[in-house]
Structure formats: C-alpha cells, structure tokens
C-alpha cells in the first residue's frame, strides 16, 4: 500500500507516520507535504497513492484545493482539529 501524508505540523506528521508503520511496516509513505502548492506539484509528478492522509488547513490554503485532481480510487482521510470543515470533508469522498 502507498500512502501520502499532507501535514504542515512536523510533530503531527511524525506521529501519523509512526502509527501507519506500526499498522503496516511494508507501507510506502511519502511526505509530509506542507503546502497546497507542494501537494499539487507532487500529485502531478507521481502516481496516485492508495490513500492520502490530509490536514485541511495548510499555510497557503486548504488541502481541498490541491486534491481536486486526485484519482477517484484514492481514499482520502482528513486529519484536522477544525470542526468547521467536517461537512465539506464528509462530502469529499
């Protein structure tokens, strides 16, 4: 399985990476990507991952803006402390 982490807080990204490795030591994990711009560039130049773990609020916008071009077979799990994005996240996939 291939995963991508989009998270602008180093500590949170490392915690998530550790949890994923504990679940599946064979998992390939890319990231963390820290901005919408960086995420768009990565998605254009790499094959779609199986799953994306994305913080919503990033330093240059919201991750929804970068994920529009994601393959519809890619699962997206939003990880955020901001409940105002919950409805939009539920509607995303």
What does each model-identified segment do?
Residues 49-93:
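CheY-like receiver
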Residues 10-14, 86:
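Charged phosphotransfer/docking patches of two-component systems
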Residues 24, 45-46, 92:
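Alpha-helix termination/capping residues and helix-transition junctions
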Residues 24-30, 34-35, 74:
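A generic structural motif
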Residues 1-2:
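Non-catalytic signal-transmission and effector/linker regions of two-component phosphorelay proteins
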Residues 14-18, 22:
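Charged docking surfaces used in two-component/phosphorelay signaling
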Residues 17, 32-51:
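Acidic, metal-coordinating helix/loop segments flanking the phosphotransfer/catalytic sites
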Residues 7:
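Conserved acidic carboxylate
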């Amino acid at each position: 399985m291939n995963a991508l982490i989009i998270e602008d807080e180093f500590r949170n990204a490392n915690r998530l990476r550790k949890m994923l490795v504990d679940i599946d030591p064979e998992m390939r994990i890319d990231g963390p990507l820290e901005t919408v711009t960086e995420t768009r560039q990565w998605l254009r130049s790499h094959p779609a991952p199986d799953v994306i773990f994305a913080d919503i609020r990033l330093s240059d916008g919201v991750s929804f803006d970068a994920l529009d071009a994601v393959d519809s077979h890619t699962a997206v799990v939003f990880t955020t402390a901001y409940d105002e994005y919950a409805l939009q996240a539920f509607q995303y996939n």
